[in-house]
Amino acid sequence: MRITEGSAVIEVPEAYSGPGRRSPGFYNADQVLNRDLTIDLINEFGVEKVLDGFGGSGVRGIRISLETKAKVVIAEISPSSCEIIKQNIAINNAEADLIHDNFQCVSSHIAFDYIDVDPYGSPVPYLDAAIMNVRKGGYLGITATDQSTLTGSTLNKTRRRYGAYIVNDIYRHEMGIRTLIGYIARRAAAFDRYIEPQLSIWNHHYYRVFVKVGKGVNGADKMIENIGYLNKHTTIDNSFKDVNEGPVWLSNLNNAELLEKIRDPRVSKKIEMIKHDNRLLFVDLTDIARKTSLSLPPLAKVMDEIMKHGYEAHRTSFSPTGIKTDCPYAEVSEILKAYAKR
């Protein structure tokens, strides 16, 4: 079947939406936003040489070739997928080089300004190669679809894979992204490198983060100050479990200046939703309503009340009933109680 995405026309055996499959020429329709953002950021970063490390159908690398000024290399280990990618490169008359080899080999033999890590499942096996081989001041785009691991749903697996302890609660997706970035940062520090998060999203079944990579002991030492543990019982409200979670990334998830530069209408809704996600955690109205046996009021009304009390209040991408605010949890609870009495 033939798919049109962005400027590319792709021939694929099948189109699929969901966590992913191990099949030749795999095309995931749920990842269109992921690829749109990748195009936008590569254009903003101004990089010259790009590695699409997991070719699949070739759609990402072909779109980068057609929609940016970067030179593109597509790596793919599957012979069947390589044949599909060759066909799609020809269909689009794209200037993309296809290499039939695994990610680690290709990334270690050619210097790249941007490396895209979008594997089936966890990115963990590929992070060291990406961090070590991207050029100084270069960028990584990393996708993780192992959400159950990153959100603490499988505690032992979370410990094994990411060396972290996470409680699977209303904060699971923010904590999942902070766990992922924290792990990337720790791996970077092991090689005297450091990262600066540029953009981070949760979308459906995957997390996607973009980071800038620098080199140097001083930068690495400064970066690790942003990795640590948090206790929701002491930092949010005593109704939460009294445990230390982490290690996680405690600093910004997004580069605010970069977000302001992205004007693509295809991604504008998501960009607007993540603009205030740098603040650590949030207050969730569903959580408060459940604990206080109150009906859930309109989110906008509660945000207005919070701002009338002199605090900031913004939507968050991590929960449809979450508010990023500097208003204490207990005070938001009192605002809900007062609203319920009207």
UniProtKB/Swiss-Prot annotation:
The protein's name: tRNA (guanine(26)-N(2))-dimethyltransferase
GO MF: tRNA (guanine(26)-N2)-dimethyltransferase activity; tRNA binding
This protein's encoding gene: trm1
First-level EC class: transferase
Residues engaged in binding S-adenosyl-L-methionine: 35, 60, 76
Superkingdom field: Archaea
Pfam families to which the protein is assigned, alphabetical: TRM (PF02005)
Location of the Trm1 methyltransferase domain: 1-336
Organism, as annotated: Thermoplasma volcanium (strain ATCC 51530 / DSM 4299 / JCM 9571 / NBRC 15438 / GSS1)
UniProt keyword list: Methyltransferase, RNA-binding, S-adenosyl-L-methionine, Transferase, tRNA processing, tRNA-binding
GO BP term, example: tRNA N2-guanine methylation
Function: Dimethylates a single guanine residue at position 26 of a number of tRNAs using S-adenosyl-L-methionine as donor of the methyl groups.
Similarity-based family: Belongs to the class I-like SAM-binding methyltransferase superfamily. Trm1 family.
Documented EC number(s): 2.1.1.216
Reactions it catalyzes: guanosine(26) in tRNA + 2 S-adenosyl-L-methionine = N(2)-dimethylguanosine(26) in tRNA + 2 S-adenosyl-L-homocysteine + 2 H(+)
Keyword presence, Chaperone: no
